[in-house]
């Protein structure tokens, strides 16, 4: 008989009366009046093994096994006695009467029980191998596998070719910091780990591969959050001879296919499309969570002439904004709730949080409760009530500051209230999945510190055709042929139509204050390739980690990656990064400089 004939979790009634050989780990061992029960676990689940004292040698071995011992058992599949069926297990109607028990490897006492749901992340990541044995982690990583498989199936059917691109490439520090790799044979020179395969996939389009994809690692040396890792996985795609709408349709269908085949979710038949400017105006975010049924009301123009300087000063500032957020039934929020929200928005740079409770709208000023009403004229109050559509029992929150502060603070407040218990109880958030496309992004952002424009996405994104003339006259007016797929407030994919003409790419570099010499040094290989009849092309990259995190309902992408880093970019399992031998440094022609100590 083979070492293993079945998986533990797949032993069911169809094997009744058969002898099976199983391998796995001891989940639990119970001694019930001379009969030992072992819950044996493998990747497919659990099966109950019964060890009778009739077989003395086997029983003696069973008495010595403990949790997480790796064992092999051979035995007879039989029905469980009446009244002992476990409906929660796939194998819950049967048990295996053990004939032979072999300990393949003993285990020291684990530092935690696998069913402990209150483990710290530090403990989990330090003992990641044991953490990965837990059913939830097994589920998450198998879900990740299925998502990757379904992406490949779809792309294969659509004529895409899986092509690997280099992991050691050229540093082009235009976005996040690169991870640098020193070259031993080229002293003083460095490779960079790719932040994305962007330029290589464009070169593949010039090389006539027409449709490319790969599921690949990317690397960015940036501060980490719950949805970021220094190394992450993209479903990276590029295609030739398709327009922006066709590209979006193609990959919208892919995401719809993946959700249906992996978690049986039917996404919208057609994803809504929203310009960037509308998303910022209504939600203060370029990745709005459409489940939350709250929107901003624009008040900037209405507050320019009020005497209340808190509103009028930002309303008249070039980069200022005044916006309101009406919360239906928010009048029942306590002063403690409001104070808590006030402290919350300070995290995002807001100086405070103005508010008005609408008790009796028909009474005008007298029907309102607020510390700011005394600073506003009746006409201004009427304008606020009319624009927000406020009703009795509502509360209106206000933000007035630089537009970025208003968008960040009021946008965060919108999500916090919407997803709160109050929001759920009052229908301010919907269940389910709310996808959309956000399009027409600004091509450039102005960097005040460097006094120049920088690429909002990357410098290879094509401007909209009607905005080409602005590249040399007014870059700030340029909109890009860029698009992000957003799902429940997460950007799960982003892409664009690329620049395929060398003269346009050179104009973009000039708009970014990248001179001809610098452009040739950094991107000469691309500029040269674009001169050889480069086709119109575009693409998109999806964050595999993010997609699986959402599907699994996980709190962090670290819960869907086998061996992730912490928020300090450390691997607690292997203790990476770590010092290296002086000899290795000499071979790489590197000398370490100690970081400067802060002055006392």
UniProtKB/Swiss-Prot annotation:
Residues 198-201 are annotated as: Aspartate. InterPro entries: Aa-tRNA-synt_II, aa-tRNA-synth_II, aa-tRNA-synth_II/BPL/LPL, Asp-tRNA-ligase_1, Asp-tRNA-ligase_1_N, Asp/Asn-tRNA-synth_IIb, AspRS_core, GAD-like_sf. ATP binds at residues 220-222, 229, 491, 543-546. The record marks 32, 83 as: Important for tRNA non-discrimination. Aspartyl-tRNA synthetase with relaxed tRNA specificity since it is able to aspartylate not only its cognate tRNA(Asp) but also tRNA(Asn). Reaction proceeds in two steps: L-aspartate is first activated by ATP to form Asp-AMP and then transferred to the acceptor end of tRNA(Asp/Asn). PANTHER family: ASPARTATE--TRNA LIGASE, MITOCHONDRIAL (PTHR22594:SF5), ASPARTYL/LYSYL-TRNA SYNTHETASE (PTHR22594). This is Aspartate--tRNA(Asp/Asn) ligase. It comes from Burkholderia cenocepacia (strain ATCC BAA-245 / DSM 16553 / LMG 16656 / NCTC 13227 / J2315 / CF5610) (Burkholderia cepacia (strain J2315)).
């Amino acid at each position: 008989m083979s070492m293993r004939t079945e998986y533990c979790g797949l032993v069911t009634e169809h094997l009744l009366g058969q002898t099976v050989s199983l391998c796995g780990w001891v989940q639990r061992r119970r001694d019930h009046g001379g009969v030992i029960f072992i819950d044996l676990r493998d990747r497919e689940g659990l099966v109950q093994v019964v060890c009778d004292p009739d077989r003395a040698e086997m029983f003696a071995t069973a008495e010595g096994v403990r949790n997480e011992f790796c064992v092999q058992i051979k035995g007879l599949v039989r029905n469980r006695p009446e009244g002992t069926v476990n409906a929660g297990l796939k194998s819950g109607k049967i048990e295996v009467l053990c004939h032979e028990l072999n300990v393949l490897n003993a285990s020291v006492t684990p530092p935690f029980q696998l069913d402990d749901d209150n483990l710290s992340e530090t403990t989990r990541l330090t003992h990641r191998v044991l953490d990965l044995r837990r059913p939830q982690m097994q589920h998450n990583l198998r879900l990740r596998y299925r998502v990757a498989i379904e992406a490949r199936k779809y792309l294969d059917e659509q004529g895409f070719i899986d092509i690997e691109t280099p992991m050691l490439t050229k540093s082009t520090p235009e976005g996040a910091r690169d991870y640098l790799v020193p070259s031993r044979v080229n002293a003083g020179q460095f490779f960079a780990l790719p932040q994305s395969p962007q330029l290589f996939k464009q070169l593949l389009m010039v090389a006539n591969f027409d449709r490319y994809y790969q599921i690949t690692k990317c690397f960015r040396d940036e501060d980490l959050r719950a949805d970021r890792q220094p190394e992450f996985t993209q479903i990276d795609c590029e295609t030739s001879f398709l327009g922006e709408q066709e590209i979006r349709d193609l990959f919208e269908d892919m995401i719809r296919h993946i959700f249906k085949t992996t978690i049986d979710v039917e996404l919208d038949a057609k994803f809504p499309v929203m310009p960037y400017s509308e998303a910022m105006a209504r939600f203060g975010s370029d990745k709005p969570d459409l489940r939350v049924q709250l929107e901003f009301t624009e008040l900037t123009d209405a507050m320019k002439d009020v005497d209340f300087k808190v509103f009028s000063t930002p309303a008249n500032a070039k980069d200022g904004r005044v916006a309101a957020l009406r919360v239906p039934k928010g009048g029942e929020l306590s002063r403690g709730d409001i104070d808590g929200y006030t402290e919350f928005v300070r995290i995002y740079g807001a100086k405070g949080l103005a508010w008005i409770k609408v008790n009796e709208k028909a009474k005008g000023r007298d029907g309102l409760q607020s510390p700011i009403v005394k600073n506003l004229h009746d006409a201004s109050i009427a304008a606020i009530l009319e624009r927000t559509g406020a009703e009795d029992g509502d509360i209106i929150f206000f933000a007035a500051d630089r537009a970025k502060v208003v968008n960040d603070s009021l946008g965060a407040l919108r999500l916090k209230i919407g997803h709160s218990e109050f929001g759920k109880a009052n229908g301010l958030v919907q269940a389910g999945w709310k996808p959309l496309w956000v399009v027409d992004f600004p091509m450039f952002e102005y960097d005040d510190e460097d006094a120049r424009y920088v690429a909002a996405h990357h410098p290879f994104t094509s401007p909209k055709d009607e905005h080409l003339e602005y590249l040399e006259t007014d870059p700030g007016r340029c909109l890009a042929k860029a698009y992000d797929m957003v799902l429940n407030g997460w950007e799960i994919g982003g892409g664009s139509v690329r620049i395929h003409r060398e003269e346009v790419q050179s104009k973009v570099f000039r708009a970014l204050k990248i001179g001809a010499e610098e452009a040739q040094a950094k991107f000469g290989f691309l500029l040269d390739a674009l001169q050889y009849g480069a086709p119109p092309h575009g693409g998109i990259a999806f964050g595999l980690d993010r997609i699986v995190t959402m599907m699994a309902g996980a709190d962090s992408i670290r819960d869907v990656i086998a061996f992730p880093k912490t928020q300090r970019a450390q691997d607690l399992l292997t203790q990476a990064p770590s010092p290296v031998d002086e000899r290795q440094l000499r071979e790489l022609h590197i000398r370490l400089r100690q970081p400067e100590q802060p002055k006392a």
